[in-house]
């Protein structure tokens, strides 16, 4: 096993994990941005089975969605990967990971306290390091020879700050994604300085609160399901969970990112690629079609689609 890789094991977190880091280490971690760890969240009630579904990849090989996501992560130079899962799911996820299972650490989110809590469950795993964060119910398809995760990691290393991938998204889809507003600071690399973060806004709220010059009318920069975050996010989350203890309201990652934008440089980037969300209606089908049309069997798939369209009959 290569140096730095973690054997497949399972950790359990029911309480909000403590997070402590010296000022010196915090400064050095951001200065280096040596991103070697990744966290994949897959513990949500509606999310937990989606990474286990089978797809045919661009090479025509059948594998789980999880395996495809892990390959995306590995291509970005990541050495250690944690997957946040629901209790009892480790065996299924280990099997779905196939030959990549030895790279994984499984972290059980024993209480269903939401996405932000799932991310914070990995605080001990990420420690004082910046890390790549992905959701387990998205597929990422690059339009270049460099994977989406590799693009984002390269940008984070160059910018030495937290960075979220975003995608121009029509307002009809805002109910599914967080959205950001900000100033375009690098047109060539499509980098934005984030000043506003909203959690699944309505079109009216987005129009009133988000300003992104240059986007088409009715379109907003929505999260891609992929971030590189600094250790500061865990300090912010720890404080938010402490303040929220005993209350019925939830802690959202969106709020933590908004605080992050106030305390350190935080940017967003449009990548050369697209996200495909398994969690929406026909999402898995759309992801499979995208893979097929970008792969070696494209012509065969197109012929099948033409035949299907020619013979399909609606009610």
Regions found by a protein language model. Give the residues of each.
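Leucine-biased recognition of intrinsically disordered, low-complexity hydrophobic segments
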Residues: 5-6
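Conserved N-terminal catalytic core of the sugar/cofactor nucleotidyltransferase
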Residues: 23-47, 54-133, 139-144
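Conserved alpha/beta core of the MobA/IspD/sugar-nucleotide pyrophosphorylase nucleotidyltransferase superfamily
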Residues: 206-315
């Amino acid at each position: 096993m290569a140096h730095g890789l973690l054997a497949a094991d399972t950790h359990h977190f029911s309480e909000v994990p403590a997070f402590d880091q010296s000022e010196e280490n915090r400064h050095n971690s951001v200065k280096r941005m040596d991103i070697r760890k990744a966290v994949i969240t897959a513990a949500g009630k509606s999310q937990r089975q989606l990474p286990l579904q089978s797809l045919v990849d661009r090479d025509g090989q059948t594998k789980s969605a999880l395996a495809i996501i892990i390959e995306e992560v590995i291509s970005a130079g990541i050495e250690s990967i944690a997957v946040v899962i629901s209790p009892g799911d480790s065996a299924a996820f280990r099997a779905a990971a196939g030959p990549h299972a030895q790279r994984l650490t499984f972290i059980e989110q024993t209480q269903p306290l939401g996405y932000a809590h799932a991310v914070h469950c990995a605080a001990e795993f990420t420690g004082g390091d910046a890390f790549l964060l992905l959701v387990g119910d998205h597929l990422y398809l690059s339009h270049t020879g460099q994977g989406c995760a590799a693009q984002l990691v390269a940008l984070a290393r160059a910018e030495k700050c937290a960075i979220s991938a975003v995608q121009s998204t029509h307002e009809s889809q805002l109910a599914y994604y967080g959205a950001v507003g900000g100033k375009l600071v690098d047109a060539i690399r499509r980098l934005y300085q984030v000043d506003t973060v909203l959690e699944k806004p309505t079109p009216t709220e987005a129009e009133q609160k988000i300003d992104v010059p240059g986007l088409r009318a009715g379109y907003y920069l929505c999260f891609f399901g992929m971030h590189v975050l600094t250790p500061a996010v865990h300090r912010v989350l720890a404080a938010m969970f402490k303040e929220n203890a005993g209350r019925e309201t939830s802690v959202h990652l969106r709020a933590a990112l908004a605080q992050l934008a106030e305390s350190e440089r935080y940017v967003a980037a449009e990548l050369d690629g697209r996200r495909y969300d398994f969690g929406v209606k026909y999402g898995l089908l759309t992801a499979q079609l995208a893979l097929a049309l970008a792969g070696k069997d494209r012509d065969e798939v197109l012929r099948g689609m033409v035949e299907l369209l020619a013979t399909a009959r609606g009610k």
